[in-house]
Amino acid sequence: MGLTRRIIPCLDLKAGRVVKGVNFEGLRDAGDPVELASRYNEQGADEVVFLDIAASKDNRDTMIDVIGRAADELFLPLTVGGGIRTVKDIQDILRAGADKVSLNTSAVKTPDVINEGSHLFGNQCIVLAEDVRRNYEMRDGVTPIHLADGRVCWYEVVIYGGSQRTGIDAVSWAQEGVKRGAGEILLTSMETDGVKTGFDLEITAAISENVDVPVIASGGVGTLEHFYDGFVKGKADACLAASVFHYGEMTIRSVKEYLASRGVLVRL
C-alpha cells in the first residue's frame, strides 16, 4: 500500500444549501456548504465533493457562486457533480474554481462528453461516477462477481439517482470510461448506500483490479473498520462518506488515526 489513501467527505447541495442534516457544534449555519467544507478542511480532509442533487438551470448560478466561495476559502481539491451535461458545463464549473467534475448520468447518455472533457481540460479533471446495483440474472457479456454469501451476480450501472437500469456492466463501463479519458472512478453501490453496513467490497475490488486509475469507494460507511476494509479488501484509493461525518459520529482525524494505527498510509 505505497500510495497515501484519501478520506473524502461529500456534501449534498440543493439550491446552494447542504440538504443532508448536519450536526456540528458551533456552526453558525449548518446549511452553508463553504462553512462545512472549511470544518472538514480543518479536520484533515484530503478533498471535498459537492453534489448538486437538484441540478437545474436555475441552480447553476447559485452553484457557481458556492464553488467560487469554496475555492477562495479552501486549500484542498474540490470535486463538483450533478447536472453536468456538456463541455460548457464542465468549463463553467472548473472556471468557477472546482478542481474536478464528476459525470454520472450524462456520461452514460452521451459518453463523448468524457472524451471531450478530458481532451480539453485533462483527464485529472474528469471523474466518472458510477451508481451500480446487483443483478442476479446472469447473461453473456457481463462480469461475474462472486459474493461472500456464495451467490454470483453482475453489477449493473443505474442512472437518474438509481431509478433507471441501463443493462450496462459496471466493470466494462469503468474500463470504457477510463479509455475515453476519465482519470478517476467514483463508485457507489445502491446495495449498501445509506445502510451503514460497510462498502460493497466485491464490486469495489473488481473495479479497482480492472482499471489503472484511482477508485473512490462510496456508500455504506458506519464504522472505522469499514474504512479500513474499503482500502484493504476493496483496494480503493479513497473512501467517501457523508452522514457519519455530518452527524459527528466520527471525525476525519479519528478515521485517519485509526487507519494509521492499522498500517494504512494516510496524510495526518
Curated annotation (Swiss-Prot):
Q: Where in the cell is it found?
A: Cytoplasm
Protein EC: 4.3.2.10
Query: Which UniProt keyword terms apply here?
Result: Amino-acid biosynthesis, Cytoplasm, Histidine biosynthesis, Lyase
Coarse class of the primary localization is: cytoplasm
What is the top-level taxon of the source organism? Answer: Archaea
Task: Cite the Pfam families for this sequence.
Answer: His_biosynth (PF00977)
Matches recorded under InterPro entries: Aldolase_TIM, His_biosynth, HisF, IGPS_HisA/HisF, RibuloseP-bd_barrel
Residue numbers annotated as active site:
D12, D131
The annotated pathway is: Amino-acid biosynthesis; L-histidine biosynthesis; L-histidine from 5-phospho-alpha-D-ribose 1-diphosphate: step 5/9
Q: Which GO annotations describe the biological process of this protein? A: L-histidine biosynthetic process
Its catalytic activity? 5-[(5-phospho-1-deoxy-D-ribulos-1-ylimino)methylamino]-1-(5-phospho-beta-D-ribosyl)imidazole-4-carboxamide + L-glutamine = D-erythro-1-(imidazol-4-yl)glycerol 3-phosphate + 5-amino-1-(5-phospho-beta-D-ribosyl)imidazole-4-carboxamide + L-glutamate + H(+)
Any one GO molecular-function label of the UniProt entry: imidazoleglycerol-phosphate synthase activity
Query: For this UniProt entry, what's an example GO CC term?
Result: cytoplasm
- Per UniProt, the enzyme's principal EC class comes to lyase
Q: Which family does it belong to?
A: Belongs to the HisA/HisF family.
Subunit-structure text: Heterodimer of HisH and HisF.
Described purpose of this protein according to its UniProt entry: IGPS catalyzes the conversion of PRFAR and glutamine to IGP, AICAR and glutamate. The HisF subunit catalyzes the cyclization activity that produces IGP and AICAR from PRFAR using the ammonia provided by the HisH subunit.
Q: What is this protein called?
A: Imidazole glycerol phosphate synthase subunit HisF
In the UniProt record, the gene name given for this protein reads hisF
